[in-house]
């Protein structure tokens, strides 16, 4: 039996990442699921996992090597153990999971505690793709178990192969924290139903009384034995239980060697979970059929971009980055209905969640406009629905308010979509939502300092310190935390809202907001050449006060909306270029976090395309590699990856809602994009390897006279050509 088991493994790994021997690799075959899954620091790395789902899938499925929490994902490539397999909704390393559960195939004695059930992770048996994952392990009794799973958006299909086992079983953990969950075992139907009410971020947002994720598990084999457990105490034969730390188990006949489990998930109820499972996997489709369909779906999306002149490593890094941008925001609706975590009702319509807006407004959302335009209106509409259901658009929906980060960057996402032609939502409702961000301070604004990740105080933070910002033109450091960063980002959001106001004819708002978009000037200290905190009295505060995830160098160039004005403040083009050079040459630039992601493209406003082109290769090489530690910072729901994609293609969305891209330089000789609006864009840089700079840029044969190109021209398709003459 063991020899047969290992032979099956050999076949399995042959087929894991490719269609067949001798076949040309497809884009999906280049994806390395483990890039960014570890790093030199416990939290400062990619924070990615080899989770399996459909593009933008509602529920992801992932091997667990540790207990996840805020600041730790469930999988880390440096770990040497396996504690289970999870249905998870944790979107990022610094955000919490919710509505999750864990399974662990076992043999012999039941082990419920994560430390007791941990087994060595056999890395040489592990294989992960966007649509499939497998790994094998050895149980304490010496028997071997292979786990495989594939997934759709709301469902999954697991296959457990038990070799040399006289007591095959599956352990299930439905809850492990205060909110807990419940489990019901239905042996007559070979079925388990469970729910989980936990939200790791619950202390950062409002209480949800009706929240739960429901799961329906259908087994291919009957249960020979079953029971539940709470806090490690086992109740043999018990069919149901509910508690903070709760789970169950099922045993199979001693001669069972393969068990298949089909799982549906839902935030509505068990009936919807079963319906999702029926729609996406059903009862008749085989594991191989579901896996093949998942591969086809991912490959169809990834095939929207083709590349010439790139190495195997380059293609791997690119398509892995592309894959990461197709995970978020994630679907939250279920075939025409969705549970709202804002008013706790069931609504009709389409919904998305997991909007890491402080990060993703910069490049992730602009990238999706090009390659997922069919989802663009629905993603904006989801934000508007949140406003209609709660009175505000959250800064970080996970899945409800969390008061994480600063700024109200849904303003930038919505206005940018509007400027770039996305109009399939209630325009005036969208404008009312972002206008409220600009003109309505949070409740008891001046009573709280609004520290990052403060416990929920009963109100949404929105723009903390907006009261003083509207009076004096800046957020006061003696009243509100993160005052410098907030002032700079409110000014950007004001600019973005102003562009939508202008388009909709709200000219009084437009003029007021454009004036406010220059509020960054109020914190610029000409004596130091840096932005600096001010107290409510107008006096300068200490130069290390008021920043978010950085210091004064991190925010020195954090003005996207009025770069000419910033250049003037800093003494003109020559002085500005010199300051940018110092930023890069003296080690001040940090690509591992978002505030500086646009900095290299600021050279475009000084007509120094050559500076952009000579610096980009070094930034790319230092921060993106084909290895588990290949991301220098948290991917943040696709932002790090989207920056890479734009930057290797030769243009970047420097200023949201401006309607234009700044130019860079393609990293490879040719790209071809099948834009999701049906147009095609070709990017050409012939003999790229021979030239460090290619400053002559033409679009459809016409030479560009400045290092920018309109977004709408790119969307219309054509040929963008870089050359030396």
What are these regions (language model features)?
Residues 672, 685:
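Conserved catalytic core of nucleotide polymerization and phosphodiester-bond processing enzymes
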């Amino acid at each position: 039996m063991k020899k047969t088991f290992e032979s099956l493994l050999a076949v399995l790994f042959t087929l894991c990442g490719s269609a067949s021997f001798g076949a040309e690799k497809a884009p999906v075959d280049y994806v390395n699921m483990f890039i960014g899954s570890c790093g030199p620091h416990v939290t400062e790395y990619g924070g990615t996992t080899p989770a399996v789902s459909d593009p933008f899938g509602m529920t992801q499925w992932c091997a667990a090597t540790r207990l996840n929490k805020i600041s730790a994902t469930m999988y880390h490539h440096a770990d040497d153990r396996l504690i289970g397999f999870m249905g998870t909704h944790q979107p990022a390393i610094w955000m919490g999971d919710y509505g999750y559960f864990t399974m662990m195939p076992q043999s012999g004695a039941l082990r419920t505690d994560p430390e007791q059930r941990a087994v060595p992770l056999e890395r040489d048996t592990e294989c992960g793709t966007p649509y499939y994952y497998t790994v094998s392990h050895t149980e304490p009794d010496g028997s071997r178990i292979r786990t495989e799973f594939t997934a759709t958006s709301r469902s999954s299909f697991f296959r457990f192969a038990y070799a040399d086992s006289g007591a095959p079983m599956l352990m299930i953990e439905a809850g492990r924290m205060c909110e807990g969950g419940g489990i019901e075992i239905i042996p007559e139907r070979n079925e388990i139903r469970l729910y989980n009410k936990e939200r790791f971020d619950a202390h950062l947002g409002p209480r949800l009384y009706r929240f739960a994720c429901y799961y329906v598990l259908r087994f291919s084999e009957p249960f020979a034995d079953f029971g539940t457990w709470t806090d490690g105490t086992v109740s043999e034969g018990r069919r149901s239980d509910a508690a903070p730390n709760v789970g169950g188990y099922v045993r199979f006949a001693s001669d069972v060697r393969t068990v298949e489990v089909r799982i549906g998930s839902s935030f509505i109820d068990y009936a919807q979970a079963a319906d999702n499972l029926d729609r996406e996997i059903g009862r008749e489709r085989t594991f191989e059929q579901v896996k093949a369909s998942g591969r086809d779906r991912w490959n169809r999306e990834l095939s929207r971009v083709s590349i010439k002149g790139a190495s195997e490593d380059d293609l791997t890094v690119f398509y892995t980055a592309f894959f990461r941008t197709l995970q978020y925001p994630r679907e939250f609706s279920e075939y025409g209905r969705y549970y709202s975590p804002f008013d706790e009702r069931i609504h009709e319509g389409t919904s998305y969640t997991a909007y890491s807006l402080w990060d993703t407004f910069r490049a992730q959302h602009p990238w999706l406009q090009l390659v997922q335009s069919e989802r663009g209106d629905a993603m904006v509409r989801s934000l508007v629905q949140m406003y209609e259901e709660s009175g505000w658009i959250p800064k970080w929906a996970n899945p409800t308010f969390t008061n994480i980060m600063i700024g109200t960057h849904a303003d930038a996402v919505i206005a940018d979509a509007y400027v770039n032609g996305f109009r399939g939502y209630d325009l005036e409702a969208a404008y009312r939502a972002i206008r409220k961000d600009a003109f309505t301070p949070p409740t008891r604004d001046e009573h709280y300092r609004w520290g990052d990740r403060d416990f929920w105080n009963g109100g949404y933070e929105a723009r903390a310190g907006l009261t003083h910002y509207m009076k004096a033109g800046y957020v006061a450091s003696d009243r509100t935390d993160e005052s410098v960063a907030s002032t700079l980002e409110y000014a950007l959001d004001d600019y973005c809202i102003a562009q939508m106001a202008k388009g909709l004819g709200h000219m009084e708002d437009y003029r007021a907001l454009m004036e406010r978009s220059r509020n960054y000037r109020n914190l610029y200290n000409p004596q130091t050449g840096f932005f600096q905190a001010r107290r409510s009295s107008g006096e300068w505060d200490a130069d290390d006060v008021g920043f978010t995830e950085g210091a004064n160098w991190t925010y020195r160039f954090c003005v996207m909306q009025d770069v000419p004005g910033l250049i003037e403040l800093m003494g003109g083009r020559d002085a500005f270029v010199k300051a940018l050079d110092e930023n890069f040459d003296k080690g001040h630039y940090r690509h591992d976090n978002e505030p500086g992601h646009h900095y290299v493209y600021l050279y475009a406003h000084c007509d120094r395309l050559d500076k952009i082109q000579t610096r980009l290769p070094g930034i790319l090489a230092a921060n993106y590699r084909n290895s588990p530690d290949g991301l220098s910072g948290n991917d943040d729901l696709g932002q790090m990856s989207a920056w890479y994609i734009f930057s290797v293609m030769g243009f970047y969305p420097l200023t949201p809602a401006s309607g234009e891209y700044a130019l860079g330089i393609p990293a490879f000789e040719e790209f071809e994009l099948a834009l999701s609006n049906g147009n095609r864009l070709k990017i050409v840089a012939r003999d790229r390897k021979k030239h460090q700079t290619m400053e002559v840029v033409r679009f459809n044969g016409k030479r560009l006279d400045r290092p920018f190109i309109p977004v709408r021209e790119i969307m219309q398709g054509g040929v963008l050509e870089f050359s030396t003459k």
